Regions:
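A Trp-anchored, charged/polar loop motif used as the substrate-binding/catalytic surface
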Residues: 1-12, 102-107, 161-178, 241-248
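Amphipathic alpha-helical interaction motifs in eukaryotic regulatory proteins
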Residues: 5, 9, 43, 47, ...
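N-terminal charged/capping segments associated with class I S-adenosyl-L-methionine
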Residues: 1-116, 129-156, 191, 196-197, ...
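Substrate-binding/catalytic lobe of Class I Rossmann-like enzymes that use SAM or dcSAM, i.e.
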Residues: 185-308
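Short catalytic micro-motifs in class I SAM-dependent methyltransferases
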Residues: 125-126, 250
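A short glycine-rich, Lys/Arg-flanked "PGG" loop and its adjoining helix->strand segment in the class I
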Residues: 119, 128, 135-185
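Amphipathic alpha-helical protein-protein interaction segments
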Residues: 30-31, 35, 97, 106-107, ...
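A conserved beta-strand element that flanks and buttresses the S-adenosyl-L-methionine
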Residues: 122
Length: 338
């Protein structure tokens, strides 16, 4: 059984099938083509469970969280189709879902909901994005400027790694602290994020994607499309944590019990037989595209398409040279509010 379903089943079992659920889903924009994918999965599982047990459908209050400025209208326009498919999946016209969905803009590292109002929290990739670039790297007079690099790399200084680690730890602690106020005792959270299985991030595969982006940006500097100074002052507010970092922060914050931490390896491109160019396109279709949207404020929106095209080419060449498909490590973390 998927970890998400197991956590929902445990919640329903421990709470005695309540008449209403409140769910918060963080990071629907990380699924640009299917923003309601996780919500569809969760609500269908809950309603089918109630239907199987002969219980009346519970009221489900679902809050979608995204960064300020995100256009929730795109999601809301898809609701009629989603509700129709949900009814079909339940398989009973007499069992009518009672579902209320709303959008809540705001940073996930801060309080967003009333105290003890959430029964279940789901987060997809949101926690990889830092609230800011580590301050030590954004100060032009500071020697920690990550010159010609956009992220942690093999040639980085130890201080660069420490700066990223400290920022992630601070952000993750703030997320846990905020949710500890909002989640009811016995409530669950399932957090999915990319990570790594080695303590040192520099040689890990988690840096590869950003190394390729850095190479693409350097190529555009050489072509005169990007100013070198802009590249030198550009750092990605993103971090893929080590497993022990996740465990340590959960234990340190103290409000949640760690139930499960599952590690999965996922390919950049689903089929091993795909061409190198397809691998390049697949790898840049999500995370890098999100970063380029942010980077457009730094480099200018007119350069985004050129960067996206070049980084796809760089990844395709790397995939062709290595003759093997690159994989990403993904964590699924399940916790219970004490």
């Amino acid at each position: 059984m998927p970890l998400l379903h197991q956590a929902l089943l445990d919640l329903m079992s421990s709470s005695g099938l309540p008449e209403s659920f409140t769910i918060a889903d963080f990071g629907c924009s990380s699924r640009p083509h299917h923003p309601l994918l996780a919500v569809s999965d969760m609500t269908a599982f809950i309603y089918k469970r109630y239907h199987e047990l002969g219980r009346s459908p519970p009221e489900l209050w679902v809050y979608l969280n995204e960064f300020p400025g995100y256009d929730f209208n795109t999601v809301f326009k898809s609701l009629p189709d989603y509700l129709e498919k949900l009814q079909e999946e339940i398989g009973s016209n007499s069992f009518r879902p009672l579902l209320y969905i709303s959008g809540v803009p705001g940073p996930c590292h801060e309080r967003l909901f009333p105290s003890k109002s959430l029964h279940f929290v789901h987060s997809s990739s949101t926690l990889n994005w830092l609230s800011q670039v580590p301050p030590e790297l954004s100060d032009r007079e500071n020697p920690l400027i990550n010159k010609r690099k956009v992220f942690i790399s093999k040639t980085r200084t130890p201080e660069v790694i420490k700066a990223y680690q400290a920022q992630f730890q601070s952000d993750f602690a703030s997320f846990l602290e905020s949710r500890s106020e909002e989640v009811v005792p016995g409530g669950r959270m399932v957090l999915t994020l990319r990570g790594r299985t080695t303590p040192d991030p520099a040689p890990d595969k988690s840096c590869l994607l950003w190394d390729y982006l850095g190479q693409a940006l350097q190529d555009l500097v050489q072509k005169g499309l990007i100013e070198e100074e802009k590249l030198d002052t550009y750092n990605i507010p993103y971090y893929e944590p080590y497993t022990e970092e996740i465990k340590a922060e959960i234990e340190k914050q103290g409000s949640f019990t760690l139930d499960h931490l599952v590690i999965n390896s996922i390919p950049w491109c689903e089929k091993a037989t795909t061409t190198a160019q397809m691998i390049g396109n697949a790898a840049t279709s999500t995370t890098v595209h999100e970063e380029l949207e942010i980077g457009s404020l730094h480099f200018g929106s007119e350069i985004v398409d050129s960067v996206f095209q070049r980084v796809s080419e760089v990844i395709a060449l790397a995939a062709d040279d290595t003759k093997q498909e690159q994989e990403l490590v993904c964590f699924a973390v399940s916790v219970t509010r004490k």
